[in-house]
Amino acid sequence: MVLGRTLLREWLLAGEAPETASVTIPEGFTLEQASRRWAKEIDGFDAATYRRIAGDDPPVVDVDGYKQGTTLEGLLFPATYEVLRTLKPRRAVKLQLEALYGNLEKVDLGRAREANLTTYDVLIIASLVEREARVAEERPLVAAVIWNRLREGMPLQIDATIQYALPEYKEQLTFDDIEID
C-alpha cells in the first residue's frame, strides 16, 4: 500500500486520522480504467481532469527514454493507495509517479542497458508481459517471446497489443479484432 507523505502530515497536524479511501489500481489498467477507478472510490474526483493531466497535459517525467509531453499511460504505478477523500486528480497522478520512481530505484536495469533498452522500453515491455501472461509462471516465457520478436524486428502479434488498441477490454478477441493494424 502506498501512503502519501501529505496524508501522513495531515494526520500528524490534525491529531486524528482524516477520512481516507483505499484505492486499488491493478496492473494492466489503462489510463481510462484508472480514471474510472479513482472516480468510483473518491467522491467528487474528476476523471476527465485526471485523463487530461495524465494524457494530454502530463507533468515532466524523469524516466529514461520517455518522450516528454506524451501520455503517462504505462507510467502510472499500479498499487493500493491510501488517500484522503479530498484527493484531486493532479495529486493522484503525482502519487502514482512517486510510486513508480520509488519502485524503479529497486530494479536492476543492467541487462536492459546491455540490450540498448531504455527504462521506458522496459516499462512498456513489462506492461505487455503483465497483460499477456495469465499466471506468474508464464511471464518469463511471454517476455522471451516479446524480446525475440523485437530483436528480430518482427511484429509482436500478441493479444496484449490488440487489447490496448481496442476501446474496451474483451475477454475473447475476434478475427475482426486481430485484423487491426
Predicted regions and their residues:
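Conserved catalytic or metal-liganding residues and their short signature motifs at active sites
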Residues: 1-157, 164-167
